[in-house]
């Protein structure tokens, strides 16, 4: 039982660390991903994506 609790705690800690590292990578990149909003003043859409006019979201570019 103690082993299971430790396994769960370490698993959650690893998941938290991985998600934090992924978030840092995304914020450093500085571009909006697929279906993210692309309002003026925000970073531009990522490569291969284009900002649509009426909905202001990043979709597959032309």
UniProtKB/Swiss-Prot annotation:
Propeptide boundaries: 22-29
GO MF annotation list: ion channel inhibitor activity; toxin activity
GO cellular component terms attached to this protein's record: extracellular region
Tissue expression summary: Expressed by the venom gland.
Compartment(s): Secreted
InterPro entries named among the record's database cross-references: Huwentoxin-1 (IPR011696)
Matches recorded under Pfam families: Toxin_12
Signal peptide: 1-21
UniProt entry keywords in alphabetical sequence: Disulfide bond, Ion channel impairing toxin, Knottin, Secreted, Signal, Toxin
Recorded domain comment: The presence of a 'disulfide through disulfide knot' structurally defines this protein as a knottin.
Family that this chain belongs to: Belongs to the neurotoxin 10 (Hwtx-1) family. 30 (Jztx-14) subfamily.
Known role: Probable ion channel inhibitor.
Name this protein carries in UniProt: U8-theraphotoxin-Cg1a 1
Species this chain originates from: Chilobrachys guangxiensis
């Amino acid at each position: 039982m103690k082993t299971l609790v430790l396994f769960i705690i370490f698993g959650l800690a690893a998941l938290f660390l991985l998600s934090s590292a992924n978030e840092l990578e995304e914020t450093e990149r500085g571009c909006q991903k697929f279906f993210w909003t692309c309002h003026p003043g925000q970073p531009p859409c990522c490569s291969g994506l284009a900002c649509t006019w009426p909905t202001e979201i990043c979709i597959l570019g032309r």
